[in-house]
Amino acid sequence: MSGASDFLSKGIDLVQKAIDADTATRYEEAYKLYYNGLDYLMLAIKYEKNPKSKELVKSKFTEYLTRAEQLKDHLEKQAQNKSTAESSVNGSTKAKKSNGDGNGSGDDNDDADTKKLRGALAGAILSEKPNVKWSDIAGLDAAKEALKEAVILPVKFPQLFVGNRKPTSGILLYGPPGTGKSYLAKAVATEANSTFFSVSSSDLVSKWMGESERLVKQLFTMARENKPSIIFIDEVDALCGPRGEGESEASRRIKTELLVQMNGVGNDSQGVLVLGATNIPWQLDAAVRRRFERRIYIALPDVEARTRMFEINIGDVPCECTPHDYRTLAEMTDGYSGHDVAVVVRDALMQPIRKIQQATHFKPVIDETDGKEKLTPCSPGDEGAREMNWMDLATDELKEPPLTIKDFIKAIKNNRPTVNEADIAQHVKFTEDFGQEGN
């Protein structure tokens, strides 16, 4: 609730500034403030739990959106008039010549608009691969196999997918926060020999509200031009929530365009995969849900996956934990998401640093890596203990204490799981009704 109220207060503050600028005829400033405020109001609507409050915010959202679109039209006409005036001063015959008989200005405007839309989407194309391999993801075997079937196989063996046998065109990954949905998408981007478009609702909504549906259309056009391609939409629920009376016209248009493009009406969409991710799949519009042919539940990791997660996250940091210790830690973290385990490991990795900071005594030990004598934190009663602190040590004198299972147990006590039973129950119910297991 505090999140919704924070978004609401920020949105109201920005909208009030927009109204002040609007009244003072500073229309360009007002336009930007309106849309910044609308972004926050949209987030407030998403997280508001009280139905009456939600309806009130929605009605205000629609009112301010209408005014913002009016200002946008006014500013565009103003810019067009200015451009026309400048061209007439600089020689209108030159402009006519470039347009042939002078009737081609509409096409030029269309080209300019298309360039603008493509420019807005340019950042969505991943030119560098994220370097996340399938082996970096613990568990989720069913989800990985489904993604390989939809993404890797059709590119590597196109002869397998002919006639009525076609690869999946829409996959929805859903589950509690921190279970690895976006991480799976990164693995797809790394492993697939395809153009990867990564967008969120803000890329398609908050740039230009009035042109959002054209932005969606251009996204799919670019994907078809560069196929095989993958469109990854994170937090797809923010873009495709259920229909209702309080839904804004802009939101409705975006959703309609997305449905049309995902359906491939009038276009050849073979070779384009839409990959969606959401934490709240039950908030998806039913028609959008149907467009995602496969809906895969990314559940909390089991004990085997958590064991592997501890090993992966520790990496090459010096550690005295045995395979049995990793298993013990995995059993202690039942109910933890992949992100929760990563947080525990990050906390544990800092424990040796904290020992160094808090130590009052250090003793000499031989560093096995270079055979030199160095100093490491110890108890005052240890043999050879010297009273000193870390500030007294030279940079190359310090030998960091190794990680032990005690460091991890302490970190587990400090970091509790972030997913509750009620959230899991909703995902299980959705899976029983519409989805499939991804573990």
UniProtKB/Swiss-Prot annotation:
GO terms for molecular function: ATP binding; ATP hydrolysis activity; protein homodimerization activity. The keyword ATP-binding applies. Residues 8-75 form the MIT domain. It comes from the Eukaryota. InterPro entries: AAA+_ATPase, AAA_lid_3, ATPase_AAA_core, ATPase_AAA_CS, MIT_dom, MIT_dom_sf, MT-severing_AAA_ATPase, P-loop_NTPase. Gene3D superfamilies: 1.10.8.60, P-loop containing nucleotide triphosphate hydrolases, Phosphotransferase system, lactose/cellobiose-type IIA subunit. Belongs to the AAA ATPase family. This is Vacuolar protein sorting-associated protein 4. The lineage of its organism: Eukaryota, Fungi, Dikarya, Ascomycota, Saccharomycotina.
